[in-house]
Amino acid sequence: MMKTYIGIDPGKSGALAVIEENGDIHVWPFNSVKYAEVLTHLASVRDEIKCCVEKVGAMPGQGVVSMFNFGHNFGFIEGLLLGNWIPYQLVPPQTWKKEFCVTSDKNTSIEVCRKLFPHVSLLPTERSRKPSDGMAEAILIAEYARRRF
């Protein structure tokens, strides 16, 4: 029985990360079709899945459209998890960030992720030059799930 740990940053520039028991790490920037493929596949082939989704609330200054889009993404992700019978826990950002000494500065997520997992690319596409903080955070959330559950 192989354990699989999933971390999801549900934001607009978020990502889905998978850490397998053997240490393999996979990460995808937000893409609804890819998320559906990955979660449906994992649910069909894995016996034990531990999933953590970042629990994010409204932030001061965010507009109505921005919050609607965030809620839409979150609902989509929650629907995929529930539809595939994947149990999950909502984890506040402060909780998982404390585990890794990550601050609110998105660059610290990238730095910590690179130290823990130097072999994992944080570039969302082959043409990207800037690492994705959403991908880094999804990996750290998956690692939080691995350590805690």
PLM regions with names:
Residues 1-149:
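Phosphate- and other anionic-substrate recognition elements at nucleic-acid/protein interfaces
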